[in-house]
Amino acid sequence: MSKLTKKQKKIAEVIKPNQLYTVADAVAILKQFASKKFRESLDISINLGVDPRKSDQVVRSSTNLPKGTGKTVRVAVFAQGDNAAKATAAGADIVGFEDLADKIKAGEMNFDVVIATPDAMRIVGQLGQILGPRGLMPNPKVGTVTTNVEAAVNDAKSGQVRYRTDKNGIIHCTVGKADFAPEDVLENVVALINDLKKAKPASSKGQYLKKISLSTTMGPGLPIDISSIPV
């Protein structure tokens, strides 16, 4: 059996088995173990009471986090004419049409979010094998296929997170950085859960929010007391 590292020993001393934490307490503990070399993200995992094998129980949506993610987001927009001008004015990093598709096919992927107007989907659809596996394919359900490109760019830049249940019925997303104030993280978590409740499939029965855990990029995951979240 391998020996525990100094960090692992400290984690074992601080984190109590089978204990549930408030968001504030979890953030305070995770801050202790966060890297000093880079800003670690605070990530949340929420186990939902859905059957992801059923198409009508797949939860896919987006949330505008009131306190943002702490990350600089690069946005690419497929649009032309007035919509292209609006996207550029809103702060999109890359705007194009067929030329943007050619860049992506050539391997230029310097962006985190892709937005497209409906008329651009005939072009974007050809990029499914490139964008899809990276979670970048525009989708109307999360607001990335839209005629209102200005609002979509603003949302993406200001802290919108997109999520979809995985094969185990769990959604994963970022709710801030390890150096965020606990109250800011809580505000983001509340916004996320409220949106998840609105997105609950009608066919989902029983307990919907089953388990929640909070972790940093390189740190442990802490189970959260759902009843302590004011939603």
From Swiss-Prot:
One of its GO terms (cellular component) is cytosolic large ribosomal subunit. Keywords: Repressor, Ribonucleoprotein, Ribosomal protein, RNA-binding, rRNA-binding, Translation regulation, tRNA-binding. The keyword rRNA-binding applies. Signal peptide: none annotated. GO terms for biological process: regulation of translation; translation. One of its GO terms (molecular function) is structural constituent of ribosome. The keyword Phosphoprotein does not apply. PROSITE patterns: RIBOSOMAL_L1. Gene3D superfamilies: 3.30.190.20, 3.40.50.790. Belongs to the universal ribosomal protein uL1 family. Binds directly to 23S rRNA. The L1 stalk is quite mobile in the ribosome, and is involved in E site tRNA release. Part of the 50S ribosomal subunit. This is Large ribosomal subunit protein uL1. It comes from Legionella pneumophila subsp. pneumophila (strain Philadelphia 1 / ATCC 33152 / DSM 7513).
